[in-house]
Amino acid sequence: MAKVYIITGPYGSGKTEFCIQLAKKIAGESSKKTVIADLDTVNLSFRSREKVEELMPLGIEVIGGHLDNNTAQDVPAVSFAFLSAMNQDKNLIIDLAGGRIGTNLLSHCYDYLKDAEYEFLCVLNSFRPDTQNAEKMVDFVRVISGAAKIKVTGLVSNGHMIHHTEKKHVTLCRKEVIKASEILQTKHYMTLIKKEFYEDLKNEINFSENVLIFDKLEMRKDYQ
């Protein structure tokens, strides 16, 4: 049976960035094949299926829309081929569209998920309008859980301002995510942090959660 990681979050949270970094980490640590199911048919600016050529040599398969596995496909079409991966011994990462649209889609997959070993993770960035503080984060997570018909099992802290990110963005967001996790009684699953910041912060912060350290952003070329 697959280990399933379902990733949601508001637009601009860095949800897809997290999916790719998580896939690279898992693929490097596990003997099982890792699959990313790119179900983001809404955000056309940055999608995990645009990284197919880079991820394949790492043993990471990307499942996109049903017409093709290419970046030219901008129609709102979803492949449900990823469901078969749940019956195989693979690591499956599901990259949902941001907000309620993605989680509404997930609700149709409930029968497949209920018996699976899964984590339903919400990526949060306190430097986005919908999730500026713990209270707004809590409201967002509750709406998402209701739409998906399954409970969010963990929160991911991803404080960033893309290429203008500083250490303070990481620490400030992390504090709000911790508060939100306490209110929701949900675990603070992970903090996503660039290597250069982690080296400075590891002596200042006692990271009780998992820490996903990355070297570079996997942004679209026209964003760099």
What does each model-found stretch correspond to?
Residues Y11:
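The conserved Walker
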Residues I7:
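Hydrophobic anchor at the beta1->P-loop junction of P-loop NTPases
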Residues V4:
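Walker A (P-loop) ATP-phosphate-binding motif of ABC ATPase nucleotide-binding domains
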Residues K15:
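Conserved lysine of the Walker
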Residues R100-N206, K221:
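Conserved catalytic-core segment of NTP-binding enzymes
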